[in-house]
Every structure is written in C-alpha cells, then in structure tokens.
Amino acid sequence: MNQQELFDKYQDTFAAQGQDLFFSPGRINVIGEHTDYNGGHVFPCAISLGTYGVYGVRDDDQVQLFSGNMEGDVVSFAITDEAPEEAEDRKWANYFKGMLVYLRQKGFKIDHGFNLYVYGNLPYGAGLSSSASIEMLMGQVLKDEFNLDIDQIDLVKLGQKTENDFVGLNSGIMDQFAVGMGKKDNAIFLDCNTLEYKYMPLELGDYEIVIMSTNKKHSLAASAYNDRVAECGEALKRLQTKLDINSLGEIDEDTFDEYSYLLNDETLLKRTRHAVFENQRTIQATKAMTDGDLEKLGRLINASHVSLHFDYEVSGTELDTLAEAAWQQPGVLGARMIGGGFAGSAIAIVKKDQAENLKQKVGEIYREKVGYDASFYDAEIVDGPHKL
C-alpha cells in the first residue's frame, strides 16, 4: 500500500483527513537467539518490512484505532481508560493502549484524543517482531504528536513493559531495542544485561541477507518460550549457590564446564549450554564482522541453529528444513532460525548473484517436505520509527 492509499484508508475509516504518516520497522537478529532474557548479547537490525500508522487529531478524549490487517471494527476508548482490552477481537489494541497508559502514568501530558489507522506489511507470525514494531510505532506517534520529552531508550523500555505487563507475554528487551534504536545499514551489538550498545556497519560486500518465512499457521512458541525462560531461571538459581552472578550471560564456556555439576539435570544442562555458548558466539560474530571475516560469521550462524535445534530444542521441522536446505545451496555463508522458534522465519547470508537460486531451490525442498510454500524477502536494513 503506498502513502496515498494509506491516507485514503484513513479517510474511509474515520470520515476525516489524516494528518501525519509514521513508519516503524520490524527486526531480524543476525545472531544471539534466546540470549536477551538471559542477560547476554544480541546482534539485531531493523528491516524495511514494518508497520505504518496514519494519525489524525480529535477534539474529544477518545482514542480510535483501526487495523487494516485485522478483521473487526474500530476499537475506541478514552485516554484515561487504563484497563487492558479483554474481548478477543479487541486484544490487538493492547499493544497500542499499553504504551499510552504507561506514558500517562509517567506524567507525560496526552490531553486529547486521536485516530490511528494502522497497516503492517510484516508477514503475520513470521517472527519479525510485529508486536515490537507496533509498540514502537505508538511510542513514536505519541512522542512526536504530543512533543513528549522522553529518551528513546526509555521509550524502548516502555515497549517491553507493555509486552510483559499489559499484554502479558514474557520477552526480553531485544525486539523493542532493535526496532526503536534501528539505524540504516547497521546492526546493533547490544549487551542485554547493561543495555550498553554500539552500532556496527553490516558490511556484507557481495552478500545479502534473505529472510525465509515458514508460513506455518499455528505456533507453540508462546508456551514453549515461557518454559525456556523458566528453565533458564531454575538453572541460574542452581548456579548461584556457588557463583556470584545475576544472569547466565555473565558465564563463559570454561566457567560453565567447571560448575555444570550444579545443574545436575539433562534439560537444564542443555538450556544453559545454549545460553552460554550462544552469547560467546555473538561476541565472536561481531569480531568476525570487524575483521571482515564473513566466512567465520557464517559458520557461527550455522552453529547457532544447531544449538537451537539440539540444546534449546525450539526449531522444529519447518525451520530445520529451511536452514538445512539453505546450507546445501551455492553461495550461502550461513543460515539459521531466528525468533522464538517452532514457526516464524530463518535467515540466510547468500551471495547476491545466488539469491534467486536460493529462493527457488529452498522453496522446492520446503514444499516437498512440508507440503506448502515458504515465502522469501530481501532484508533491507533501515532506521527506527519515524515520521514520513
């Protein structure tokens, strides 16, 4: 949908003219999966697929939201209404409402209503952080339209708080940080323990990143995700009987080997090994980027997928098929699942002149093995949320 079409949709929905158009990206994570809530490092970037919002001011106290992606009516509530939406066909609005509620609770002045028409081109359920994209879109709209003096990282933290406390989903800080702090042509090397970060140019030369979506319709990700968070929490508790640590991200491989006897449980051993080794792989990957060693980066990305399959057990047939099929294709440096797991997407780093071949060959293998089509997208690395 182009900009004019978005304004037309706003007009059709609210019988008024929209004033401003905003965009908020999705994200991919090059490496560092399931490390954010374990206090480790991640290496994500914002992508050109994302969420658009057309804003228009109202002269009453009502917020009216409409999604071009959801079936249903306009969701309307007063700016002073702090209760999460309970009805199934209104729950999507909580990602927006939570940001409004928490900004007002922090004392920011949001003193009149508004309309917001929202449309996203992120494939649904692809694990490209549509929820963080929405939260940071709302944050940016409110920041700009109401002239809120809030630091971008504080806005990112409110995005995570919305996800955790208002929507009720466990998540680390990575998704909101990657979206909210995105920078064109750069990935973000982020320490999720301290929120120290640095931008690193994603210089891939003759290579590009291709996003491969499973198009899987149903996902166990939410329940399994919460299980993994709990398992890592239990592992941390056992290690803390001898180690002065606050997160698994503080441990290196040698410390893991030395103190693994404290875990004394096969599942906890595997989960902790992934958290520790994936964190170290992420640190090594950024060094490989600095050294211009793309082949090493590719090997680390492959190792990440293997660890997510065997130790963290979150990949599943669809994601394994995509990654393993990509490994067999010419010009591919590395491929792995990204996101929570079980469904969603994988990425491949592939030579630009082999990208179409990758999409065709992996697509054929996937269709034959899984029974329906995968989708492929070229990842363009873009800035965070902004007014267009």
UniProtKB/Swiss-Prot annotation:
Amino acids binding substrate: 33-36, 225
Enzyme class, UniProt record, top EC level: transferase
Subcellular location(s) of the protein: Cytoplasm
EC number: 2.7.1.6
UniProt key word Disulfide bond: no
Biological process according to GO: galactose metabolic process
GO cellular component: a single term: cytosol
Disulfide topology: none
Database matches in InterPro entries: Galactokinase, Galactokinase_bac, Galactokinase_CS, GalKase_N, GHMP_kinase_C_dom, GHMP_kinase_C_sf, GHMP_kinase_N_dom, GHMP_knse_ATP-bd_CS
Keywords, sorted A to Z: ATP-binding, Carbohydrate metabolism, Cytoplasm, Galactose metabolism, Kinase, Magnesium, Metal-binding, Nucleotide-binding, Transferase
Active site: residue positions: 175 (proton acceptor)
Keyword Nuclease: no
MF GO annotations: ATP binding; galactokinase activity; magnesium ion binding
Domain of life: Bacteria
HAMAP family listed in its UniProt record: Galactokinase
Function: Catalyzes the transfer of the gamma-phosphate of ATP to D-galactose to form alpha-D-galactose-1-phosphate (Gal-1-P).
Family: Belongs to the GHMP kinase family. GalK subfamily.
Protein's name according to its UniProt entry: Galactokinase
Protein's organism: Limosilactobacillus fermentum (strain NBRC 3956 / LMG 18251)
